[in-house]
């Protein structure tokens, strides 16, 4: 017997029977009986906060087994849109991947939940770590023997944001050779300068790098271990991830770190095209987004998990990612979330 039936057959006798049988609230019944799996595809940089959200949810709903798969956000989306995999939650390090790659066929709403910025992390094993600053990092990177790392732009927002940061650095530092020296000379990336002063970075479907200078992996969290063991010297990474792993880092100017809304116009002068996916992405402030995919096996469970996330923004804050609270929502947001969001 569910709530709809109770509204139709609203007699005192039936209500009493149901009350004694523990069936007044169907969701409460589900929370204590039927075993369920809740699958999440999330960005690698969300691993720490989403581990906490997993614990919170399983504590509240012991019958639910939360299963998380961490990958680059582009790869997460493609699991759903190209590989026909299903999940109750899709959480991306770039909210725009949801409207650009999933809507309208695989999602019809999303919420923007937290922010971040790009920093450069290092260890005491990094060459010239005692000399590097926010003003000279690009010069340090050009020294013989210095090796820097970033994730693949084709798989991971942190990867294409790295390309944006380095290109934006040319204007911020007044040096038009920075991208050329760090990227063009050490990879098969290309860049177009447009007549209006904007730039388009081209990321080929197969990326080749000079492994004597560049260390690249699919997603940014795959680079943490090699950095800590000295496989390379410096890593472009989210500030939250650097904090979570107790890494030293230098902050970058607001004009290039993609973390400041006041500099959105500066960021918008650079974009990147992922040629293998025919997808063009404009540089913009870093905002994380999540949705329940339309093809989720248990859509309502996904909405329930999203509600729990929105009710606990402190989890993001404690993980070093400033929360957006209330979250900003776009599209046909489920009624259960309406009191926790503002419509964008």
UniProtKB/Swiss-Prot annotation:
InterPro entries assigned to the protein according to its UniProt record, in alphabetical order: ABC_trnspt_W-bd_WtpA (IPR022498), ModA/WtpA (IPR050682)
Annotated NCBIfam families: PRK04168.1, tungstate_WtpA
Single Gene Ontology BP annotation: molybdate ion transport
Name of this protein: Uncharacterized solute-binding protein MmarC7_0925
Short name of one Pfam family: SBP_bac_11
GO-annotated molecular function: molybdate ion binding; tungstate binding
Domain of life: Archaea
Species in which this protein is naturally found: Methanococcus maripaludis (strain C7 / ATCC BAA-1331)
Keywords: Signal
Stated family: Belongs to the bacterial solute-binding protein 1 family. WtpA subfamily.
Classification via CDD domains: PBP2_ModA_WtpA (cd13540)
Signal peptide: 1-28
């Amino acid at each position: 017997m569910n709530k709809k039936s109770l509204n139709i057959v609203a007699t005192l006798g039936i209500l009493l029977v149901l009350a004694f049988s523990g069936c007044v609230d169907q969701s409460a019944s589900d929370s204590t009986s039927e075993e369920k799996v809740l699958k999440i595809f999330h960005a690698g940089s969300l691993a720490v906060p989403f581990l906490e959200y997993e614990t919170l949810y399983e504590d509240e709903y012991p019958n639910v087994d939360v299963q998380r798969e961490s990958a680059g956000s582009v790869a997460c989306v493609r699991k759903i849109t190209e590989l026909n995999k299903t999940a109750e939650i899709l959480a991306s390090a770039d909210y725009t991947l949801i409207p650009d790659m999933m809507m309208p066929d695989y999602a019809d709403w999303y919420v923007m939940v937290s922010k971040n910025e790009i920093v450069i992390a290092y260890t005491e094993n990094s060459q010239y770590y005692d000399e590097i600053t926010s003003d000279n990092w690009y010069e340090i990177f050009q020294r013989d023997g210095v090796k820097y790392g970033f994730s693949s732009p084709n798989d991971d927002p942190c990867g294409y944001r790295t390309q944006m940061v380095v290109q934006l650095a040319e204007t911020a530092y007044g040096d038009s050779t920075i991208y050329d020296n760090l990227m063009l000379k050490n990879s098969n990336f290309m860049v177009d300068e447009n007549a209006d002063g904007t730039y388009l970075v081209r990321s080929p479907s197969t990326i080749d790098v000079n492994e004597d200078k560049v260390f690249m992996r699919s997603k940014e969290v795959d680079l943490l271990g090699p950095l800590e063991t000295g496989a390379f010297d410096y890593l472009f990474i989210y500030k939250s991830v650097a904090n979570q792993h107790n890494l030293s880092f230098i902050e970058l100017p607001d004009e290039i770190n993609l973390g400041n809304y006041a500099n959105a116009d500066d960021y918008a002068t650079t974009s990147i095209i992922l040629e293998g996916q025919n997808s063009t992405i404009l540089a913009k402030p870093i905002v994380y987004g999540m949705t329940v995919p339309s093809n989720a096996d248990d859509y309502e469970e996904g909405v329930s998990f999203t509600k729990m996330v929105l009710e606990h923004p402190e989890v993001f804050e404690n993980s070093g990612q400033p929360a957006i609270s209330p979250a900003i929502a776009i599209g046909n947001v489920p009624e259960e979330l309406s009191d926790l969001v503002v419509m964008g």
